Design a protein with these regions (language model features):
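Short, well-formed alpha-helical segments that are part of the catalytic scaffolds
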Residues: 47-80, 314-329
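Short beta-strand/loop segment that forms part of the nucleotide-sugar
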Residues: 90-97, 310, 322-327, 331-342, ...
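Glycine-rich, basic loop-to-helix element that forms the pyrophosphate-binding segment
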Residues: 140-146, 353-369
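Short aromatic/hydrophobic "clamp" motif used to bind/position activated sugar donors
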Residues: 158, 374
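Acidic donor-binding/catalytic loop of UDP-sugar-dependent glycosyltransferases
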Residues: 163-176, 379-393, 463
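Conserved donor NDP-sugar-binding/catalytic core segment of glycosyltransferases
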Residues: 180-185, 386-413
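Catalytic donor-sugar/metal-binding loop of nucleotide-sugar-dependent glycosyltransferases
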Residues: 256-264, 453, 463-480
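Acidic donor-binding loop at a coil-to-helix junction in glycosyltransferase catalytic cores
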Residues: 273, 455-461
Length: 524
């Protein structure tokens, strides 16, 4: 039978029928129906290596565990807010752990100390919840037993949900329990063909409850005896085959309709199980305020790997300075130098050999990079302190961004130039390469990378983003860049700035980019 977890500091008596699956009478508690409602949170203990295992190849054991913990923190906040509106709804936390019973019974040997520590963490997150270990041979039987437990406790409606759906809300919970009070069952479809939430009335018959949670057993029986369908009548065998191959949501929906009770279908939502889910939510963060402010939104960005891509050509001493500057960040980010030729590297960084041309170099290195975020940096730049955190913070609010710049040395003319460049991001929605452009790798490749042109690839890339309506951001911190393009006297610098302005204007009017590139090389 299922056992309650009350005080973690005291040993509880062992269950007399340990691991036994609960069984319901023919009609579930019809005579003792009450108006009490239960919210069942189904989860694992947040232990590294034992939770979110499909994320481990991507994020590692600790990273996967931290994703799970962030989801639990969001759920705890959601429940606190919801409970202020629906004080009569009781929270049950059904947890899964390899040593669940030992934790329940207070066994404090070395093998389960970690489980106990994580249980205490959950206790702090959910102080009002009743903790119960999951029981059953598969996930379906575990869910069935959780419902039986709450029904036997006198609850007329119970809603079971996982913590791995970022967009659950107070309003959605209120809608669910309103449906529960009106006698409806509830089912919420997840994007992968399963379901993220299921609500049941206690008056569901025992045979109907068995059917709702029987898919796991059907599939297991078929694995053990794949020839069993041949022994059935053709029409029965075909129906059995369809049920075995049905996705979990459709199978469960059919079983719920068969109860004869009205069914509320909730909005389809995406849970977080694998790398594709993390990528999808990371792309959504800049467009969703709730996700920006959530624990899971911040955790997804915190774990995003950054690849720093530096295009180089005839850099000389500038290259060694950049290598030295990046040395403290070797373990925090992937660093790739896109070598266009005639450079001398120290050998401590990854070098990608590319045909000469800044666009070609950056695109080639981007294909090799493994990061979730691509940061394109000019070799003559000096990075601000905390630039990696600044990048993640900027991408929390916009899908693509850059740093503000200032020139070294900072003369009055160059201060004006940097002001115009920084303001241009807001005013004209244009970023230049010397500002350090960064964005998610998916967006970069969706945009086709930098246009393969000999000049103004950064300018055209910005125009492409602008045309697609993609918002841009500007970091508060400033990146220092050299004024090597603007050598000479005050008037010579001014003439170069003016000529560059005219080159962009002529490019917008459709003049040949190769001819313009020759004029630009004359300037350099």
């Amino acid at each position: 039978m299922l056992t309650k977890v009350n005080k973690m500091s005291k040993a509880l008596p062992a269950s007399p029928v340990k691991n036994k699956i609960l069984h319901a009478p023919k009609t579930l508690f019809a005579k003792t129906r009450t108006s009490k409602q239960a919210l069942i949170l189904f989860t694992r203990l947040p232990i590294a290596g034992k939770t979110k295992t499909r994320l481990i190849p991507y994020l590692g054991k600790k990273g996967a565990r931290d994703i799970h913990l962030a989801l639990l923190q969001d759920f705890a906040k959601l429940y606190r807010n919801f409970h202020r509106r629906e004080k009569e709804v009781k929270l049950f936390l059904f947890f899964s752990s390899a040593t669940a019973h030992e934790v329940v019974e207070g066994a404090f040997d070395l093998g389960i100390k970690k489980d106990i520590a994580e249980m205490k963490m959950l206790r702090n997150l959910f102080p009002d919840a009743e903790f119960v270990p999951q029981e059953g041979e598969d996930i379906f039987l575990k869910m069935k037993n959780a419902f039986l437990y709450t029904f036997q406790e006198g609850y007329s409606f119970s809603y079971l949900v996982g913590a791995d759906i970022p967009f659950l809300s107070e309003d959605s919970f209120c809608k669910v329990f309103s449906a529960g009070r009106s006698g409806k069952n509830v089912l919420g479809e997840s994007l992968d063909g399963g379901y993220y939430g299921i609500g049941l009335q206690s008056r569901v018959k025992s045979s109907e409850l068995d059917k709702i949670f029987s898919l796991g057993k059907k599939r297991e029986d078929f694995k053990v005896n794949p020839e069993q369908n041949r022994l059935m009548k053709p029409e029965c065998a075909e129906r059995e085959k369809q049920e075995q191959e049905a996705d979990i949501f459709e199978y469960t929906k059919t079983a719920l309709y068969a109860t004869g009770l009205p069914l509320l279908l909730l909005k389809k939502r995406r849970d977080i199980d694998d790398r594709e889910d993390i990528i999808a939510y990371r792309q959504l963060i800049p467009y969703n305020k709730a996700l920006q402010d959530s624990f899971i939104g911040r955790e997804i960005l915190r774990q995003a790997k950054i690849s720093i891509i530096i295009p180089c050509y005839k850099e000389g001493d500038t290259l060694s300075k950049m290598e030295e500057e990046l040395r403290p960040y070797k373990k925090q980010a992937e660093i790739l130098f896109a070598d266009g030729g005639e450079n001398h590297f120290s050998g401590e960084y990854k070098v990608v050999s590319c045909p000469k041309g800044r666009a070609k170099q950056m695109n080639t290195a981007a294909k090799v990079a493994s990061g979730d975020i691509l940061f394109f940096l000019h070799c003559d730049s000096i990075l601000p302190k905390g630039f990696l955190e600044e990048i993640r913070e900027a991408l929390r609010k916009t899908p693509v961004a850059c740093f503000g710049i200032r020139f070294s040395p900072s003369t009055p003319l160059m201060m004006i130039c940097s002001f115009i460049s920084n303001h241009r991001v807001y005013d004209r929605k244009v970023m230049f390469g010397d500002q350090g452009i960064f964005l998610g790798r998916e967006l970069f490749f969706q945009m086709g990378g930098f246009p393969d042109i000999p000049l103004m690839e950064d300018y055209q890339f910005s125009l492409n983003l602008k045309k697609c309506g993609i918002p841009m951001g500007l970091c508060k911190k400033r990146l220092i860049t050299s004024e090597r393009r603007f050598s000479g006297s005050f008037f010579h610098k001014l003439s170069i700035m003016w000529k560059m302005n005219r080159l962009r204007a002529r490019y917008r009017k459709g003049e040949d980019i190769n001819a313009l590139a020759k004029e630009y090389r004359d300037i350099r």
